[in-house]
Structures are given as structure tokens and as C-alpha cells.
Amino acid sequence: QCLESVQSWSREHNHTWRFIDDDLFDLVPGWYMDKTGKGPIAADYARLVLLKNALSSEEVDQVIWLDADIFVLDNAMQISSGKSCAFGQEVWVQEEQGVMKARKNIHNAVCLFKQQCVVLPFLIETVASIIKRADPDRIAPQMVGPKLLSALHSLYDFNLLPQVGAISQEVAADIQSGQGPALNL
């Protein structure tokens, strides 16, 4: 259903929709795959390379990435940016020390890059550099994705796309039950 919803949204906005499976990992250098394995850390790098390649080899003004587990609730949703790139923003709700907390985070489940974007090649180089120098036993799942983007956002002030968020387990459980502390924030 997720893929179908994104495909429908793409048609609604006259975007070209493409699905890429594990071939995505073919874009990741061998040394990187050896260090990280096939998973989110490798996908973070591959996504950037794929989008850069699409911008340089196709006649497009911009590219938009939506993760395979994104579900589009409203086909009228707009994804655009006044800057050369944009990333998702979510309000993540979870319990911390017995209290529900809501935090705004940046994520890369959705991202947009335009032609001539200087951030995209910088991100590719930075992600490779971080992984090259990282201790393989200390690579965190979001190290070169959301955590890196959040750190850079404090310096660069990316355009954010809050219309594409994520639902924590606490929020999902409260939605399912129709009530709960995660929905009261």
C-alpha cells in the first residue's frame, strides 16, 4: 500500500515515479559495504548517489526521494523547496523517564534536491568520510542520516518538509486504542 500511495501521488503531480530495490546497494563502494553491511547506513549513502546521478544524467529540475515505507495520506500534498534541497521533519513522541516527550527531528525518508545543489555532493563526501573514519563497532543506525542532517541543519538551516513525518510506536498504539498520553501532547 505504501508504494502504491507514492505512485498515485506521483501521478497526481505529474512526477516520474521509479522504484529501486536492493540494486540501490550497487551504488555503494565495497569498502563501505564491508564496514556497514546492507542496511540503513549503506542506504543513506546510496540514496544520495542515486539522486546525484539522476540530476546529472536526466533532464530534470529536481529529484524527490520517498522511502518505500512512506504512506501518502493526501494526494494534494506538496513537496517543494525555495532552497536547493529540503529534508523531512517529524515530531517524534516517546516516553522518557515516565513522561511523554515530543521532539522535532530531521529525517531523510523524504528529501528533495535541485539542479546545482551544492549540498548534495558535500553530503556524499561527508558521509563517506565519516564512515571511513568510524569504528565499525560504534556506527549508530542514524549516524549519517538523521543525526548528520540535524547537526548540519543547525549550521545551514535546511528547508524542512513537515508534511512527511513518522509515527512512533507510542503514537501508533494510542491511535489504535483511540486515546492515550502520546495523543495528549
Task: Give the label of every model feature segment.
Residues N75-M143:
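Conserved catalytic core of nucleotide-sugar-dependent glycosyltransferases
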Residues Q1-T36, A42-A43, K114-V118, A134-D137, ...:
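N-terminal anchoring/stem segment of glycosyltransferases
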Residues V118-L185:
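Catalytic core and acceptor-binding pocket of nucleotide-sugar-dependent glycosyltransferases
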Residues L24-D26, I70-V72, W92-V93, Q116-V118, ...:
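Short, solvent-exposed loop/turn segments at secondary-structure junctions
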Residues E4, Y45-V49, M143-A151:
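A structural signal for well-ordered alpha-helical segments within the folded catalytic domains
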